[in-house]
Amino acid sequence: MTLPDIKTSLPGPKAKALIERDAAVVSPSYTRGYPLVIKRASGASVEDVDGNMFLDCAAGIAVNSTGHSHPDVVRAIIDQAQRFLHMSGTDFYYDVQVRLAEELAALVPIDGGARSFFANSGTEAVEACIKLARYATGRPNIIAFFGGFHGRTLGSLALTASKPVQRRGFGPFMPGVFHAPYADCYRCPVGLKPDNCAAECLDFIEHQLFMHLMTPEEVAAVVIEPIQG
């Protein structure tokens, strides 16, 4: 099959009906950029409830690195569900959690061994990083970048600077967070080209933040996305 294969107008009638039901009972705070109602997916192909087929070029929301419904992942989920469905790793011990932490520790390129903190989402991971950075360094400040998305909980939202709608109405935010221009040469925030760039984004941190708002010794962490989301 050649994808995409579109059989109806978008969204189709079944999708429209479900979206209307959703609007009546689900929080409007969710970000739904596309009127897509998925019925099933496999690999990189996605089928909606009206039978339209799409090619997923974004791995879901950039989290399905093995594709949709990879057989090995499905088997692992079924196997775990047959053993038990919930076990709080913060309260009890679990062999699979230990094995995963051991495998991660073997991959992390740091000296002295590594320890893992498991979370349910990227937002929770960012919250944990904020706490860890401040706890370990004893420093208050964090540098993030314009255009970055780090979550919508109150701590992570202080770092997020992607869209005004994500922050509107929730301030004041956690203090100690400072934003700088993100070094995106494709869409340079100061209008330069790679051949005439003199690292102005880094200069902003050194010559603006560090000269006017804080010293480097007050920085607990720099939070950056290799590819902004």
Segments and roles (model prediction):
Residues D5-T8, G12, M53-I143:
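Glycine-rich loop-to-alpha-helix module at the N-terminal edge of alpha/beta enzyme cores
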Residues P13, A17, A41, H68, ...:
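Conserved active-site and cofactor/substrate-binding residues in soluble primary-metabolism enzymes
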Residues P35-C57:
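Active-site and channel-lining beta-strand-loop segments
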Residues E47-D48, T66-H68, A158-T160:
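Short beta-strand-to-turn element immediately C-terminal to the catalytic PLP-Schiff-base lysine
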Residues E102-A221:
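PLP-dependent aspartate aminotransferase-fold enzymes
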Residues E225-G229:
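Conserved PLP phosphate-binding loop immediately N-terminal to the Schiff-base lysine helix
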